[in-house]
From Swiss-Prot:
The keyword Protein biosynthesis does not apply. The gene is EYA1. One of its GO terms (cellular component) is nuclear body. In the embryo, highly expressed in kidney with lower levels in brain. Weakly expressed in lung. In the adult, highly expressed in heart and skeletal muscle. Weakly expressed in brain and liver. No expression in eye or kidney. PANTHER family: EYES ABSENT, EYES ABSENT HOMOLOG 1. Residues 288-303 have a biased composition (Basic and acidic residues). Changing residue 41 to K: Found in a patient with congenital cataract. The lineage of its organism: Eukaryota, Metazoa, Chordata, Craniata, Vertebrata. It comes from Homo sapiens (Human). Sumoylated with SUMO1. This is Protein phosphatase EYA1. It is linked to Branchiootorenal syndrome 1: A syndrome characterized by branchial cleft fistulas or cysts, sensorineural and/or conductive hearing loss, pre-auricular pits, structural defects of the outer, middle or inner ear, and renal malformations. Otofaciocervical syndrome 1: A disorder characterized by facial dysmorphism, cup-shaped low-set ears, preauricular fistulas, hearing loss, branchial defects, skeletal anomalies including vertebral defects, low-set clavicles, winged scapulae, sloping shoulders, and mild intellectual disability.
């Protein structure tokens, strides 16, 4: 009887079909002669490794002549897949061989069902392999270099799906392509002929281990030979590391290095045959914090967000807050001081007298609103950094019928030097009256921040609208550009606008109302740096929102730039219209 001796020392095919109970299976031997259903014996001729690579469909799938299996010294553990029980009945137990699943319906040698099954090309072409092919752990040295017929080593290309992949052009079984399925991650090959079933699968734990296999001994199936059958790019580029994107660079590790998939994806079965990794949506920018981080942030805001008298200036920040934009007011959001001095007109070629006139008209309107409705006459010498700095002295009394003109607060303020920059506190009664006024200012601001015309009255409303239009025309819509960026930030649920200005708090509130900024600046987010400076205001803001959020400072002056540098905050300088447009563009692209 002729023997077939293949290149691998671990896999020899020998034996005879004379045994009535079928072939004897040893640890590294198996019969090379097969029996057909009519009882005839088919013998295989000795082949070299290069000849076996070109064997066509009339070669048996059971004779192991395919070089991808014959020369790979496959362990006898998976050989039960090539011994259909209807051909070689045997009652002899083989403990080293896994039992054949009952659902396996393999056809006998020589029948045409294999060709029919292999022609079901669509069953294989639509299955992307999410990890190592066939559920087998890394082939070790096989991935680093695969021997071809010529003996040269080739690297596995990232565009090639696996050594035994099936392409759409395989109409006949190729040598070494065994009629059983390989376990995929969440799926298996299944055709109408029932040859490939999900239960009939091989995993790494059942038959493949490094001690039994000589992985680099695959001499055939060069990757260039069947390159046309492989999908050119089965994996999206963002799921591959940069070190493996070149098909010509050998790798010392496994060729396919996929990034860690999101949790919950690895255990899901592939139910859609056309499913790809591209269906996984990465988290949106910016990334949300975990629940524990948000709880800690909330507790930080409650415990540390208090003023110098241990009062809470504002509600605790939103648990999802991730970015805080700290704005300057004059010459950043609005053009006001440079109108009064005429510097804006000189810079942009406008008429200086017209510019100064518009500035004076706006200044008069600002202080008129502050004096008439915001108690500026009473509070000018009792300026605060934040609207809630004196809220701890408020007893919550109903102010609907309270008469601010007759409570004696102005006389007490002028006769006693109680409103000092150092925050010296007066009597309890006087401090309560001060707190009443700031509470009333807060109520007016929240009521009219979207309807300043209702606060001014019909006559002043028309003058205000006319003045706003003239200033916008002179300044080339500076405020409109700033409002676009402010509104975009305000529309985000994880961002907030903060205003820090060197103007006193009450005139600053009047400016915000008259320039239509109340909708993007809640009164709790407005700080006056008149007494303590912007750097100290930045420290208060950090204490309020915590250090886990990202702070961005936007302004035109040196003071805010130095404060931002000290606290390691990014600084966006505003010196022209183009800076405002660039800021809005960066916000639209979510760079900020």
């Amino acid at each position: 009887m002729e023997m077939q001796d293949l290149t691998s020392p671990h896999s020899r095919l020998s034996g005879s079909s004379e045994s009535p109970s079928g072939p004897k299976l040893g640890n590294s031997h198996i019969n090379s002669n097969s029996m057909t259903p009519n009882g005839t014996e088919v013998k295989t001729e000795p082949m070299s490794s290069s000849e076996t690579a070109s064997t066509t469909a009339d070669g048996s799938l059971n004779n192991f002549s395919g070089s991808a299996i014959g020369s790979s010294s496959f362990s006898p553990r998976p050989t039960h897949q090539f011994s259909p029980p209807q051909i070689y009945p045997s009652n002899r137990p083989y403990p080293h061989i896994l039992p054949t699943p009952s659902s396996q319906t393999m056809a006998a040698y020589g029948q045409t069902q294999f060709t029919t099954g292999m022609q079901q090309a669509t069953a294989y072409a639509t299955y992307p392999q999410p990890g190592q092919p066939y559920g087998i752990s890394s082939y070790g040295a096989l991935w680093a270099g695969i021997k071809t017929e010529g003996g040269l080593s080739q690297s596995q290309s990232p565009g090639q799906t696996g050594f035994l992949s099936y392409g759409t052009s395989f109409s006949t079984p190729q040598p070494g392509q065994a009629p059983y399925s390989y376990q995929m991650q969440g799926s298996s090959f299944t055709t109408s002929s029932g040859i490939y079933t999900g239960n009939n699968s091989l995993t790494n734990s059942s038959g493949f281990n490094s001690s039994q296999q000589d992985y680099p001994s695959y001499p055939s199936f060069g990757q260039g030979q069947y390159a046309q059958y492989y999908n050119s790019s089965p994996y999206p580029a963002h799921y591959m590391t940069s070190s493996n994107t070149s098909p010509t660079t050998p790798s010392t590790n496994a060729t396919y290095q996929l990034q860690e998939p999101p949790s919950g994806i690895t255990s899901q079965a592939v139910t859609d045959p056309t499913a790809e990794y591209s269906t996984i949506h990465s988290p949106s920018t910016p990334i949300k914090d975990s629940d524990s981080d948000r709880l800690r942030r909330g507790s930080d805001g409650k415990s540390r967000g208090r003023g110098r008298r241990n009062n809470n200036p504002s509600p605790p920040p939103d648990s999802d807050l991730e970015r805080v934009f700290i704005w300057d007011l004059d010459e950043t959001i609005i053009v006001f001081h440079s109108l009064l001095t005429g510097s804006y007109a000189n810079r942009y070629g406008r008429d200086p007298p017209t510019s100064v006139s518009l500035g004076l008209r706006m200044e008069e309107m600002i202080f008129n609103l502050a004096d008439t409705h915001l108690f500026f006459n009473d509070l000018e010498e009792c300026d605060q950094v934040h609207i809630d700095d004196v809220s701890s002295d408020d007893n919550g009394q109903d102010l609907s019928t309270y008469n601010f003109g007759t409570d004696g607060f102005p006389a007490a303020a002028t006769s006693a030097n109680l409103c000092l920059a150092t925050g010296v506190r007066g009597g309890v009664d006087w401090m309560r009256k001060l707190a009443f006024r700031y509470r009333r200012v807060k109520e007016i601001y929240n009521t009219y921040k979207n309807n300043v015309g209702g606060l001014l009255g019909p006559a002043k409303r028309e003058a205000w609208l006319q003045l706003r239009a003239e200033i916008e025309a002179l300044t080339d819509s500076w405020l409109t550009l700033a409002l676009k960026a402010l509104s975009l930030i305000h529309s985000r649920t994880n961002c907030v606008n903060i205003l820090v200005t060197t103007t006193q708090l009450i005139p600053a509130l009047a400016k915000v109302l008259l320039y239509g900024l109340g909708i993007v600046f809640p009164i709790e987010n407005i700080y006056s740096a008149t007494k303590i400076g912007k750097e100290s205001c930045f420290e208060r803001i950090i204490q309020r929102f915590g250090r886990k959020v990202v702070y961005v400072v936007i302004g035109d002056g040196v003071e805010e730039e130095q404060g931002a540098k000290k606290h390691a905050m990014p600084f966006w300088r505003i010196s022209s219209h183009s800076d405002l447009m660039a800021l809005h563009h960066a916000l639209e692209l979510e760079y900020l």
